[in-house]
């Protein structure tokens, strides 16, 4: 993770993504690595991979506001507006301390 953060700070987005990708391989349950990878992929405009990555994050942290907000951003950038709105609604519910997994579309 530290190598990814260093690359990110130096503006090396692709290199940062590779470091975060490696962190997810080493520890598939490391939510911070999935979050960082997902957002790096959004910045690289690799939106389909970003969406899949952030969906994994949501699986790991199903009540996390930032996870749903990040997923909403990626979906919106990919033009998947309905799905982005659903993820944004779940982010709001999570922010209020509710259970976004029970929100019906």
What are these regions (language model features)?
Residues 9-22, 44-56, 78-90, 95:
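Structural signature of tandem alpha-helical TPR/SEL1-like repeats
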Residues 33, 67, 100-101:
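TPR alpha-solenoid repeat register
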Residues 96-105:
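Short, charged, intrinsically disordered terminal tails
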